[in-house]
């Protein structure tokens, strides 16, 4: 029996133009055939929600996927599972979910929303999580949802000693400024001295002419002191005129008279 050469035939439904070889059309049919079968089945798995999520360790987190398939006897029965790929590209084993096929209309497209809830142990569980649907003759998975897992939440960085020193130095400067201002005000008030009460009434000249004498004081000293006080009071009354209030020099004269009277009093007493 002689070996006959292999003959290539074009796929049915693809007319071959005259003059072209059959090999290119055969290659095109091989490339288009798997996609045509996949589209004809109508199964798809789509991840809904955010493509990137973040979660703390030992905290529940959920991602969702939507399964679309034709409700026919061939695709009524299927199982839904999930798996993940870590940052190094290692794939974990598939784990079952609580999603089960639902009721639909015969020979119509049916959609099933599936939610997967996980409690991830730590940062090592960071990766892309996929929904995978297995039918008796095919398996389809989704595009995946990336989940970033953190062992702990946000923590404020510890305060550096430089920051504490800056706060302390600023507080010290504030205290010193307040104390310095208080000292300046107190010193200014002390330099002015307590003023005499302008409403103080002058003593009666008759009472000044007959004062009560202390046994240890001389008559001359007692009389001279009372007269000086009377003169100073008269000078103060003369300096309180309207013209004296208007002139700063006239306002300083009563104080000068008082100072001169005090000096004279001290000299005479000595």
UniProtKB/Swiss-Prot annotation:
Tissue: Highly expressed in neutrophils, primary monocytes, mast cells, monocytic cell lines and lymphocytes. Also expressed in spleen B and T-cells, and lung. Expressed at low level in non-immune tissue.
Keywords, comma-separated and alphabetical: Cell membrane, Disulfide bond, Glycoprotein, Immunoglobulin domain, Membrane, Phosphoprotein, Signal, Transmembrane, Transmembrane helix
The record's account of how the chain is modified after translation: N-glycosylated.
Subcellular localization: Cell membrane
Compositional bias ranges of the Basic and acidic residues kind: 194-204
Cytoplasmic side: 185-270
Keyword Kinase appears in the UniProt entry: no
InterPro entries to which the protein is assigned, alphabetical: NFAM1, Phos_immunorcpt_sig_ITAM
Transmembrane segments: 164-184
Phosphotyrosine modifications at: 220, 231
Segments in the Extracellular topological domain: 43-163
Annotated spans, Disordered: 190-219, 234-262
Cystine residue pairs: 65-114
A cellular-component GO term for this protein: plasma membrane
Glycosylated residues (UniProt): 107
UniProt-listed GO biological process terms: B cell differentiation; B cell receptor signaling pathway; calcineurin-NFAT signaling cascade; inflammatory response; intracellular signal transduction; positive regulation of B cell receptor signaling pathway; positive regulation of cytokine production; regulation of B cell differentiation
Bias kind Polar residues: ranges: 207-219, 239-250
Domain called ITAM: residue spans: 209-237
Single Gene Ontology MF annotation: transmembrane signaling receptor activity
Annotated membrane topology: Single-pass type I membrane protein
Physiological role: May function in immune system as a receptor which activates via the calcineurin/NFAT-signaling pathway the downstream cytokine gene promoters. Activates the transcription of IL-13 and TNF-alpha promoters. May be involved in the regulation of B-cell, but not T-cell, development. Overexpression activates downstream effectors without ligand binding or antibody cross-linking.
Domain notes: The ITAM domain displays no close similarity to any existing ITAMs, except for four conserved positions. The phosphorylated ITAM domain binds ZAP70 and SYK.
Assembly, per entry: No direct interaction with the B-cell antigen receptor (BCR). Interacts with SYK; probably involved in BCR signaling. Interacts with ZAP70.
Protein name stated in the entry: NFAT activation molecule 1
Organism classification: Eukaryota, Metazoa, Chordata, Craniata, Vertebrata
Gene: NFAM1
């Amino acid at each position: 029996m002689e070996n006959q050469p292999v003959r290539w035939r074009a796929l049915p439904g693809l007319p071959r133009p005259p003059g072209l070889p059959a090999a290119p059309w055969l290659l095109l049919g091989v490339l288009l055939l798997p996609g045509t079968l996949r589209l004809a089945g109508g199964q798809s798995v789509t991840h809904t929600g955010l493509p990137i999520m973040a979660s703390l360790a030992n905290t529940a987190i959920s991602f969702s996927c939507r399964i679309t398939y034709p409700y026919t006897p061939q695709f009524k029965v299927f199982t839904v599972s999930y798996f993940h790929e870590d940052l190094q590209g290692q794939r974990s084993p598939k784990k079952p979910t609580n999603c089960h096929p639902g009721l639909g209309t015969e020979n119509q497209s049916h959609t099933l929303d599936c939610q997967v809830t996980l409690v991830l142990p730590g940062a090592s569980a960071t990766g892309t999580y996929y929904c995978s649907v297995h039918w008796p003759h095919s398996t389809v998975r989704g595009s995946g949802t990336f989940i970033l897992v953190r062992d702990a939440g946000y923590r404020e960085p510890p305060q550096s000693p430089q920051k504490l020193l800056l706060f302390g130095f600023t507080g010290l400067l504030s205290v010193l400024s307040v104390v310095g201002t208080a000292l300046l005000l107190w010193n200014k008030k002390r330099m002015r001295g307590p003023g005499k009460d302008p409403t103080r009434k002058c003593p009666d000249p008759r009472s000044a002419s007959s004062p009560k004498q202390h046994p240890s004081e001389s008559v001359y000293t007692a009389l001279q002191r009372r007269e000086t006080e009377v003169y100073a009071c008269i000078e103060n009354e003369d300096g309180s005129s309207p013209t004296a209030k208007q002139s700063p020099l006239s306002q300083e004269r009563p104080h000068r008279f008082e100072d001169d009277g005090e000096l004279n009093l001290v000299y005479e007493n000595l």
